Every structure is written in structure tokens, then in C-alpha cells.
Design a protein with these regions (language model features):
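Ligand-binding "clamshell"
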Residues: 64, 113-119
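Short, charged beta->alpha transition segments
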Residues: 69-79, 104-106
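Mixed-charge interfacial surface used for oligomerization/domain docking
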Residues: 2-4, 12-20, 25-33, 37, ...
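Glycine-rich phosphate/diphosphate-binding loops that line cofactor/substrate pockets in enzymes
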Residues: 1, 74-86
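N-terminal glycine-rich "phosphate-gripper" loop used for MgATP/nucleotide binding
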Residues: 66-73, 91-97
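N-terminal glycine-rich anion-binding loop in soluble enzyme alpha/beta folds
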Residues: 6-72
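Short glycine-rich or small-residue beta-strand-to-loop segments that form or flank ligand, phosphate
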Residues: 85-93, 119-122, 136
């Protein structure tokens, strides 16, 4: 732990896992399903994962996703709270209702860890915009800012993140 608290996020930040590992940012992984088989969004840990995913798309098999459930968050947060306070920046509520499950899990764990602080923030962001917000929070953490200072910064900046999207292939949209 680089500071007095743990900064965590979800795999939808569009950054490689190695980056999160280097920055000491624990990640909760989403999954996707194709033909009834579930695959973890592994953020580049498995060199076969991206070719497999794009192979599905090329074969006309569109993946489906599901929100993270309360149990997944509770398990993730429980492990982190054993080590310290947690500031979790969640994937934006405009794309998923998962953040509501994160808030429910946080509430459930408050009784188990009354001495710990667990803050869950709806990033209001997705994709690389989400990644930029988490990256900025990690920079502030590494500069020695407090959990409360970073929370205030994220709450202020999350509405100012400008998202752009482009694709070279339109057949999937």
C-alpha cells in the first residue's frame, strides 16, 4: 500500500493490468459471455484473451456482459479492508447499475469493519475516460494527498472528463 489507503477500480478502465499492478491499484474484473461460456475481462494478462475476443467478433458472435453483483463486490472489498481503508472508483452508472451493488456491499461491510473507511464513487465515466480519472487519483495518492482530498477531486473532475469514441469497423454497431 503506497499510502494510508487502497485505491481500487474495475477492469473497464481500458488500461493494461500491468499498469494497475505497477501503480498498486487492485482491480475487480468484469466478465463477458459468448455461446453460454463466461470469460473474464483479464486486461491483457492472458496473451490469448484479446485474439479470442476479436475472433468471436469476426465470427459474428457478439458477447454479452452482466453487471457485477453485490457478492463480487463484497468479496473484493473484504479482502482489501483486511489491509486498510479503501477508495473505490467505480465504472460509471450511465453504463451499468453495478455501482449500486458496490454501494450495497460497502454498507454490508461497515458492520464487519467499523474501524475502516470504505468510499465508493460513481465515476460517471467509461473506458479510457474512466482510466484517466483513476490515473489522476493514483497520481494524487502518490503525491501524498489524503483519501478525502482525492474523493473531493474525483467528485469535482468526474463531470469534466471528455469522452471521445471512434471505430474503424462499423459492422458491430
Amino acid at each position: 500500500m503506497r499510502s494510508g489507503f487502497i485505491l481500487s477500480c474495475e477492469s473497464t478502465i481500458d488500461l493494461p493490468y500491468s499498469y494497475c499492478e505497477q501503480r498498486e491499484i487492485p482491480v475487480l474484473f468484469y466478465s463477458y459471455q459468448v455461446d453460454g461460456v463466461s470469460y473474464e475481462d483479464d486486461m491483457g494478462r492472458d496473451p490469448e484473451a484479446l485474439p479470442r475476443f476479436y475472433g468471436f467478433l469476426d465470427a459474428g458472435k457478439l458477447p454479452s456482459t452482466a453487471q457485477l453483483n453485490e457478492f463480487q463486490y463484497e468479496t473484493f472489498f473484504d479482502t482489501l479492508l483486511q489491509q486498510g481503508d479503501v477508495l473505490h472508483i467505480a465504472f460509471g452508472s450511465g453504463m451499468t447499475a453495478s455501482v449500486q451493488n458496490a454501494l450495497l456491499a460497502a454498507e454490508a461491510l461497515r458492520e464487519k469493519y467499523p474501524e475502516r473507511k470504505l468510499i465508493v464513487i460513481d465515476s460517471l465515466c467509461s473506458s479510457s475516460g474512466y482510466g484517466l480519472l483513476v490515473d489522476g487519483a493514483a497520481d494524487l495518492r502518490d503525491e501524498g494527498k489524503s483519501m478525502d482530498e482525492i474523493t473531493d477531486w474525483v467528485l469535482e473532475k468526474r463531470k469534466k472528463v471528455h469522452h471521445q469514441f471512434y471505430s474503424t469497423e462499423l459492422k458491430f454497431y
